[in-house]
Amino acid sequence: MKYDTFLLQAQIWRKIGHLSHAGCLLAFAVLFPFFTWLLHFSYTRLERRRGKEKPEFAWKSWQQWLLAGGILYGCYLLLLIACYPGFYNYDIGNQLPQIMYPEVPFTAHHPLLHTIVGGGIITIGYHLRSVDLTFGVFLYNVVQMAVCASCFSYAVVFLYRKTGNRILAVLSELFYILCPPVVMFAMSTTKDVTCYAFLLVAVLKIYQIYADLNAQKFPTVRQWITTGILLCLACLLRNNIVYVLPFAAAFAVFCTSCRRKQQILFWIVMILAPFVLNKGLMAAVDAAPGSAAEALSVPFQQIARVYVDKGEAAFTQEELDYLYTCINKEDFAMYDPVIADAIKTAFWRHLDVIMADKGKAI
């Protein structure tokens, strides 16, 4: 599998990473308002449909969810059998030994929750059928597809109950069944899949909470707790999700005055809970902390891009002397504008130099 979709392979998107400063500003000036308008249009249209929301449905919401989820899961299982055992890819190869072999220490380099759960399921499958990892990978994908089907069908039912539009609901269901990247990633052993499945439902729950607040209704404790659990799961499955929470909190509290104290309490808990829970997991399995290189992948990639585009002329001699202690000069040839892994690894080899004088590195 590739990181690229057919859309990202288009040359127009490839060139964005090589734009001049003015070009970047122009791209931002065009794309940011467009996507902001698109989100605003979608949510305001959904809000207008609330007046057409049916007070009664022939089926209860959980029955609709079971039907949509059952159809989706059945289709996913057929596709998984056709592609048996699914895709064993990305970071799970580094995570699995931590579960399978006692002599391999745990590390928080990758999300521990995914290491424990994902590695545990594959290990169980391996012990059930000890020929190779095939059955374990299949078992993992069976579980992951159940999570995806549950979350995606919740989104379909949410949309249907908000709009009452059966055609829109059917098209949404077909999208989750027929869109190749969605189906392929649903059977891929990567943390991103379950993370964004939980995040999808969390976003819909947050939408419902703030729609109620704007209508001067009071969300129940159950709504807050359910949303919090989903957000925590997303954060524990993908470390960088937590970075957006302070910005989301500030924006939400600033724009919505109703029950502001309740909002502030919720967002404070949400910012702290993933950190505390992750520390608890690290203590429970005696895991070593993750590398700081993970958090620095964006500036590493930016430095490499400037070096590749403009060469040594873009740096002073003092900067170059220090830069070559942080990364081997020939490693800049590994720069890829699409993914930062190669450059991140090159800097990671000399991370002790960077961490020894953080001020100079900054």
Which residue ranges define each predicted feature?
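Transmembrane signal-anchor helices characteristic of membrane glycosylation enzymes that use polyprenol
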Residues: M1-K2, L31-T36, K60-Y88, L272-A283
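Start-transfer (signal-anchor) and selected internal transmembrane alpha helices
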Residues: G17-Y76
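Loop-to-helix entry region of an early transmembrane alpha helix in multi-pass inner-membrane enzymes
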Residues: L19-L26, L112-I116, H127-S153
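Transmembrane-helix motifs of polytopic, lipid-linked glycan transferases
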Residues: P33, V142-T163, V201
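Extracytoplasmic catalytic/substrate-binding loops of multi-pass membrane glycan-assembly enzymes
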Residues: C83-P97, V104-I121, H127-F135
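Specific aromatic-rich, kink-prone transmembrane helix
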Residues: M100, Y154, T194-N214, L231
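Membrane-interface alpha helices of multi-pass inner-membrane proteins
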Residues: Q223-R238, A249-A250, M270-F275
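Membrane-proximal stem/loop segments at transmembrane-domain junctions that anchor or position
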Residues: A287-I362
